[in-house]
Amino acid sequence: MSAQAAAATAAALQFKGRMITVTLLRLLSPSLEAVGRELDARLADGSGLLAGLPTVLDLEALGESAAGLELAALAATLRAHGVSLIGLRELPGEAGEALRTRAEAAGLAVLNVDGSRAAPRREVEVSPRPAAEPVRSLLVTQPVRSGQQVYARGGDLILTAPVSAGAEVMADGNIHVYAPLRGRAMAGVLGDSGARIFCQRLDCELVAVAGHYRLSEQISDAERAGPVQVRLEGESLVIEAL
């Protein structure tokens, strides 16, 4: 077979199932001018933005005023400030239906809470569910190396080996690391504000609980020393010694 023929028969696409980390950005003002000013300020002091990470916009706090947003202009403003906007978080009821139509016209996906694309609503018959099986914790005994991702769906994640820089560990519940923790660690990824992260040493690039995060440069040397736990207190992450 010639090289030209081989190229013609080779697959041009490959679909792979993989989770990615998504930042949820809550919009608190419908004013594009106000949004632009705050983004300028946050870029100037280097805080608040994770440049390059996929971002989903949450409009729930705007209430009825979300209906009047110019989505295309808003998306352009965010992208001009380095926010990699991929879509909007789904809103309930009629507001959500109207938002979906306008979002798709602006080239934005509408995503539900767990990050998958929202399906059109339809009436369904609800039948009793069987009793759910107990969720088991995920135990990982091998090092999690750079570029690898481990996700404990529906439960806690327990690691007995180091998590390297560039790696990512996630759990719907708590994360326990009986070794140095580097890379990124995210507990309560579906919104469990009671989730916690426990580790022998905190050297991570990012640590988050229920979507509230702190970057490496926002963690003091004192908070890195020795075994610690990370928990959410109100809207802030607390890192304290064990």
Curated annotation (Swiss-Prot):
Protein name: Probable septum site-determining protein MinC
Keyword Cell cycle: yes
Pfam families, alphabetized: MinC_C (PF03775), MinC_N (PF05209)
Family label: Belongs to the MinC family.
Keyword terms: Cell cycle, Cell division, Septation
Signal peptide: none
UniProt xrefs under SUPFAM superfamilies: Cell-division inhibitor MinC, C-terminal domain
GO biological process assignments: cell morphogenesis; division septum assembly; regulation of cell division; regulation of cell septum assembly
The organism of origin for this protein: Thioalkalivibrio sulfidiphilus (strain HL-EbGR7)
UniProt subunit comment: Interacts with MinD and FtsZ.
Record function comment: Cell division inhibitor that blocks the formation of polar Z ring septums. Rapidly oscillates between the poles of the cell to destabilize FtsZ filaments that have formed before they mature into polar Z rings. Prevents FtsZ polymerization.
